[in-house]
């Protein structure tokens, strides 16, 4: 079996990939995550997933490298990871009662081959009061998550609905698409 590398230091992505029961290592991708001028959120996610995989693949010839990225999209504007509580409050306030699109891209780069996929998840947030936003951030300050919430935790209470073909995509790694790409690359999965 060829060597498999996850180009990420994200604990969320490591946990998800471990569900496929394949042995893998991780590598830290060094890429500039700034959007290019006029770049759509879906294109940004796709480009960053490919760049992350390529940045690690160049150091490990012969390995298959998985890169993934997620971009939250509110009315065509990319929302980054908040980083601060104030920014998380602003994001959650802006998303309150609205639909947010999450573009989650995955790239698999190996010897002389690249495979790519993109998943779209739509999250309908319920109307949130300022007090609810404060209580949520007190309980689960999701400052390292696109959209300022963790759907796998208490963040699910902020939603009215989720629409997606792959429920793992919202956590940051679309396993249905990735399993397909891995099978195409010759990995043995059920």
From Swiss-Prot:
Q: Which InterPro entries match?
A: ITPase-like_fam, Maf-like
> Where is this gene product found?
Cytoplasm
Q: What is its main location?
A: cytoplasm
Which residue positions hold the site described Important for substrate specificity? 12, 70, 152
EC number(s) given by UniProt: 3.6.1.-
Reaction equations catalysed: N(7)-methyl-GTP + H2O = N(7)-methyl-GMP + diphosphate + H(+)
Gene Ontology CC annotation, any one? cytoplasm
Q: Which cofactor does it need?
A: a divalent metal cation
- Biological process terms in GO annotation: nucleotide metabolic process
Catalytic residues, per the record, are: 69
Q: Which GO terms describe its molecular function?
A: nucleoside triphosphate diphosphatase activity
Alphabetized UniProt keyword annotations: Cytoplasm, Hydrolase, Nucleotide metabolism
Tell me yes or no: is Nucleotide-binding among this UniProt entry's keywords. Answer: no
- Give the protein family: Belongs to the Maf family. YceF subfamily.
Q: What does this gene product do?
A: Nucleoside triphosphate pyrophosphatase that hydrolyzes 7-methyl-GTP (m(7)GTP). May have a dual role in cell division arrest and in preventing the incorporation of modified nucleotides into cellular nucleic acids.
**Which HAMAP family would you find in this protein's record?**
Maf
* Name of the protein in its database record: 7-methyl-GTP pyrophosphatase
Species in which this protein is naturally found: Xanthomonas oryzae pv. oryzae (strain MAFF 311018)
């Amino acid at each position: 079996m060829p060597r498999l590398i996850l180009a990420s230091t994200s604990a969320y992505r490591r946990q998800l990939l471990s569900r496929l029961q394949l042995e893998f290592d991780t590598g830290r991708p060094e890429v500039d995550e700034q959007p290019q001028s006029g770049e759509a959120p879906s294109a940004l996610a796709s480009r960053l997933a490919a760049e992350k995989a390529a940045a690690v693949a160049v150091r490990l010839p012969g390995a298959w490298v998985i890169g993934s990225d997620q971009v939250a999209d509110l009315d065509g504007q990319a929302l980054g990871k908040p980083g601060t509580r104030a920014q998380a409050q602003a994001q959650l306030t802006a998303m309150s009662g609205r639909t947010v699109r999450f573009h989650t891209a995955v790239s698999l780069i190996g010897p002389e081959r690249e495979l790519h996929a993109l998943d779209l998840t739509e999250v309908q947030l319920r109307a949130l009061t300022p007090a609810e936003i404060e209580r949520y951030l007190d309980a689960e300050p999701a400052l390292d998550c696109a959209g300022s919430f963790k759907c796998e935790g208490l963040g699910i209470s902020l939603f009215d609905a989720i629409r997606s073909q792959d429920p793992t995509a919202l956590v940051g790694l679309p396993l249905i698409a990735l399993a397909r790409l891995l099978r195409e690359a010759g990995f043995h999965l059920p």
